[in-house]
Amino acid sequence: MRKIITTTICALLFSFGLYAQQDAMFTKYMFNSLVYNPAYAGSKDHMAIGLLHRTQWWGIDGAPTTQSITAHTPLRNDRVGVGLNLINDVIGPTHSIQANISYAYRIPIGKSKLAIGVQGGVNSWRADWTKLSLEQQVDAAYDDPSPSFILPNFGGGIYFYNDRFYMGLGVPHLIEYDLRKKGLDGGEVETPIWAKQYRHYFFSTGAAIPLKGEMLVFKPSILIKNVGLLSGINKDEAYQNLGAPTEFDIDLSLMFYQAFWIGASFRSAFEAFDDTSSFDSVDLWASYYLQNGLRIGAAYDYTLTKLQGPAQGSFEVMLGYEFNYKTKQLVTPRYF
């Protein structure tokens, strides 16, 4: 049973060209905003560093595991922020490493700020198809047993925020790549799907609503993810076969005394092309800010899909550090 499930995951996720959500997924996305939107760089007004590990569908061989490292800070010019994000993503026989440098310029609008950000970097992707047990031993799609790519990357985003509200749109990968490898005869391999890296769009918004002063703050947020929205595919049949659903994460959380944070979220998806929807998971998470500027957190996803039986949920652990850039004195963390 486990081997069958693993093979199914390979078929659905391992093919880098599959027209689906290709970017890494995180339950604690609100602590990893730089990954989705380069305009977030420097928005905390002090340097912030974060490390996050995710194990998805724990208990299934070949299931995704992801690590991210982010760091961002404002410069002496308060309007400029810079950042760095690294992502290591392993799904069965495939391995992807991304590195991006971000630059954001902030424009004051009353008590709010509008940031415009760009990023540039590189994505290294490779696979080892010999780890798969193929139903068809002669498959043109796997003529190259160890394909690899080095892909330059450029992204952009906008981010509007103040002390109580934020809204942003990020496109971390603006360039789309045709990833079809040449066959043994020199021609392009015929596959039932288009081997392509697609453009992803991430829309996020949230608020911080005091319920009892700063002692108790309610913080709702949402992240909407779409892939291939403007890819220029005109064939309805191709859309139906290859179109990834629009996914959304809805999160509701409470923060106590600006230190202890608990939340619950719901992840689902809507397929615009055949009017269907699906429930992916319900999630619980907690985070704590220590007095020395350290932040720790963890999350658990309860799967609602057909993997509910063999998988034992998904897990995330997070470690962060924040400090005041100008005075080097540790400060109370901000809400966003």
Task: Give the ranges of each region predicted by the language model.
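Absolute protein N-terminus
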Residues: 1, 20-21
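Positively charged n-region of N-terminal signal peptides that target proteins for export
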Residues: 1-4, 109-110
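Residue-level detector of intrinsically disordered/flexible regions characterized by low predicted structural confidence
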Residues: 4-5, 221
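Generic early N-terminus positional signal peaking at residue ~5-7
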Residues: 5-6, 25
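Bacterial N-terminal signal peptides
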Residues: 7-17
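Subset of outer-membrane beta-barrel
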Residues: 21-336
